[in-house]
Amino acid sequence: MSFKEMPLMSDKKGIVLFYPYIPKKSFSSLKNVLSGRWIGQGPMVDKFEKKFSKKFSNNHSCVATGAGTDALHIAYILAGLKYGDEVIAPVYTCTATNIPFLYMGVKIKFADVDPTTMNISIESVKKLITSKTKAIVCTHYGGLPCDMDELKKIASKNKIPIIEDAA
């Protein structure tokens, strides 16, 4: 089945929010994984991490996580966020974007979204940023990228990281 054969909207089903696409060439690999005895970490995960690291990272190893929330939590820790810090995050996002902040005791300042893209509003970020802001979190909603050029300018000016939630 090709992507063109999977309509995102139909008269019978309405708008399909999550329509998994698994190419037929992946079926045998999936069967091997699912029929294997490894539930979590295992040989296929090791292979994936190595291939991903080689393709997307120069000097760093990549770590596969069980969920996007786990990956974001790790990213927030690696960004140096700690109890009492303040971050700016979009008001419209999956709860997974912000749940780790609750574990960590990080204060969230919610930025409005641009109604045409549903991504974080640059103007809202500019209004919310203070000397207490330790990071900006953005979510690329529905596969539509945020205005990273503008966010990078703000982050650079304030010497803070941007953490992108692309899940």
Positions of predicted regions on the chain:
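N-terminal "arm"/small-domain region of PLP-dependent enzymes with the aminotransferase-like
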Residues: 1-39
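Generic structural signal for small/hydrophobic residues in well-ordered secondary structure
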Residues: 29-30, 52, 71, 87, ...
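Phosphate-binding glycine-rich loop
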Residues: 38-86, 100-104, 110-112
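Conserved coil-to-alpha-helix start sites within the AMP-binding
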Residues: 92-98
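Active-site phosphate-binding strand-loop segment of PLP-dependent enzymes
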Residues: 116-167
